[in-house]
Amino acid sequence: MTARIGVVTFPGSLDDRDTQRAIKLAGAEPVALWHKDKDLKQVDAVVLPGGFSYGDYLRAGAISRFSPVMETVIEQAKSGMPVLGICNGFQILTEAHLLPGAMLGNNHLHFICRDQKLRVENADTAWTSDYEAGQEIHIPLKNMDGRYVADERTLDMLEAEGRVAFRYVVGGAAADGYGNPNGSLRDIAGITNEAGNVVGLMPHPEHAVEPLIGTGRTDGLPFFTSILKKLVNA
């Protein structure tokens, strides 16, 4: 049986179709989910894609968090369903309290769009098992509100429990994708929940799945092959 991975479309989503294509390339079946529907159509996992849902009014992800579909996503995530939040999806996950912390405006107050160097910190989640811990990858990044923040106690907890999933790689030229692009505390690019089934990150793996587009690399494809293997072997 083919694994079914749902992709939610909110008003203002930009990358839902790209995410569906990435899922298909990985060998799973993408399933379109609408923000007004509570029915997840018997999917095995869910992706909240990037974009500017509801125009980022009030706060990025704050309105989407109350969409009817999110009631079911929150319930299922707490029961163990794998959920991935990409960019705006990450913002929604923090607003829904499925992941700790919050996303604020970039420290330089500008929209940023570039290829970004990341280091895999946790390769034991539902979405990262096809990577190796310490592996460095290139993933496109595009955001205005990408600065991850949390209080020191939460940051220390994430570090101690190995819940920092990805970190921006510093120490090189920005033109080569190095550096913290938005002022995220402790260079955090992505985190996971305690169970490892919910992951959020700001960069866009769905834009790095084919060699002819994006970075010219396929460094984002393991997100989708990781979850496929987990679902098939469950």
UniProtKB/Swiss-Prot annotation:
InterPro entries: Class_I_gatase-like, PRibForGlyAmidine_synth_PurQ. It is found in: Cytoplasm. GO terms for molecular function: ATP binding; glutaminase activity; phosphoribosylformylglycinamidine synthase activity. GO terms for biological process: 'de novo' IMP biosynthetic process. Its main location: cytoplasm. The keyword Plastid does not apply. Keywords: ATP-binding, Cytoplasm, Glutamine amidotransferase, Hydrolase, Ligase, Nucleotide-binding, Purine biosynthesis. PROSITE patterns: GATASE_TYPE_1. Its EC number is 6.3.5.3, 3.5.1.2. It catalyses: N(2)-formyl-N(1)-(5-phospho-beta-D-ribosyl)glycinamide + L-glutamine + ATP + H2O = 2-formamido-N(1)-(5-O-phospho-beta-D-ribosyl)acetamidine + L-glutamate + ADP + phosphate + H(+); L-glutamine + H2O = L-glutamate + NH4(+). Signal peptide: none annotated. The active site is at C87 (nucleophile), H204, E206. Residues 4-234 form the Glutamine amidotransferase type-1 domain. One of its GO terms (cellular component) is cytoplasm. Pathway: Purine metabolism; IMP biosynthesis via de novo pathway; 5-amino-1-(5-phospho-D-ribosyl)imidazole from N(2)-formyl-N(1)-(5-phospho-D-ribosyl)glycinamide: step 1/2. Pfam families: GATase_5. Part of the FGAM synthase complex composed of 1 PurL, 1 PurQ and 2 PurS subunits. PANTHER family: PHOSPHORIBOSYLFORMYLGLYCINAMIDINE SYNTHASE SUBUNIT PURQ (PTHR47552:SF1). Part of the phosphoribosylformylglycinamidine synthase complex involved in the purines biosynthetic pathway. Catalyzes the ATP-dependent conversion of formylglycinamide ribonucleotide (FGAR) and glutamine to yield formylglycinamidine ribonucleotide (FGAM) and glutamate. The FGAM synthase complex is composed of three subunits. PurQ produces an ammonia molecule by converting glutamine to glutamate. PurL transfers the ammonia molecule to FGAR to form FGAM in an ATP-dependent manner. This is Phosphoribosylformylglycinamidine synthase subunit PurQ. It comes from Streptomyces avermitilis (strain ATCC 31267 / DSM 46492 / JCM 5070 / NBRC 14893 / NCIMB 12804 / NRRL 8165 / MA-4680). The lineage of its organism: Bacteria, Bacillati, Actinomycetota, Actinomycetes, Kitasatosporales. The gene is purQ.
